Amino acid sequence: GQKEEKTFNMEKKTLKQRIKENPGLKQAVHRFIMHPVKTRPNWWIRLFDFIYLKRGKGSVIYRSVRKDLPPFNRFSLGKYSVVEDFSCLNNAVGDLTIGDYTRIGLRNTIIGPINIGNHVNLAQNVTVTGLNHNYQDAEKMIDEQGVSTLPVVIEDDVWVGANSVILPGVTLGKHCVVAAGSVVSHSVPPYSI
């Protein structure tokens, strides 16, 4: 009856689901994967990132790119997309998805949760982040208040000019252009500048 059904349902859970549901196990796995001080995975995890990072045909991530991509959130790079030198990719707090034929320019910082569409061009020194540090309690240190996330969505055929910042919760509509040096804190409709 009921006991058999419960056992059957537990067998369907993935390892990832079981880890997320067990706080002690989740903490142990996190300690194994992440360095205690640095905000990047331990070196032995980075050695095997080719196993869990999804990359499309012809995609390129230059060697100097910092890949803060632990396996507990999704990362995918579409076919024929490029991440140029000295950029930082980070999915520690949310999934990071980059579509096909997309170019992430020099020295970009991309912190999930983010969904970047197809044929998107991010010029040099662009920051796109779905992460924000909490600071509601003036009695507590900011670094003790945790973080919050709001997904960023960059739809297809968008161009973001150099030195721009795209903040959490923003959607850049299809075929829009963000001028160089912009700070984008509100969503931008499709086909606009």
Each model region followed by its residue ranges:
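Glycine-rich hexapeptide-repeat left-handed beta-helix
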Residues: N115-I193
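Short, Lys/Arg-enriched N-terminal segments with co-localized hydrophobic residues
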Residues: G1-N9
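Domain-scale signature associated with acetyltransferase and cell-envelope carbohydrate enzymes
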Residues: F8-T129, E155-D156, S164, P190
